[in-house]
Amino acid sequence: MSMSSCILPGVGKPGFVLKENEIEIGMGIHGEPGIERTNVKKAREIVDILCHKILKDMDYTNSEVAVIINGLGGTPAMELYIITKEIDEILKTKNITPYKYFVGNFMTSLEMAGCSISLLKLDSELKQLLDAPCNTIGLKIGD
């Protein structure tokens, strides 16, 4: 979901243009236009739309999931955590248990304002791997 495009390097202009009251849903990480546009809405309404699109692709009922809320480069952390709270509430109403959240700027699109949401359905092996220590530039888990 994006509330703005990014300025494409070498092109010098946005990949798409939104009206003042529009958001783009399903845009590409490189600034490509999305699959639909809608008017700006409250956080819960936007997250409802995004979760509906994600949850219709796979049955997550009675599952544990890892959730990634990825900032696109121009979104304050506070807004990402508002989105996280809304996702948490929605998942719990659908009998989906969030095991771990990753919230931050993991794969940005320059200065684009918005976020992407990813769910990973977990089994015991994936949970063990997610909990394993790692120390990279983009992610640190454990000591």
Regions found by a protein language model. Give the residues of each.
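Mixed-charge interfacial surface used for oligomerization/domain docking
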Residues: 1-82
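C-terminal non-catalytic interaction/assembly regions of soluble proteins
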Residues: 53-143
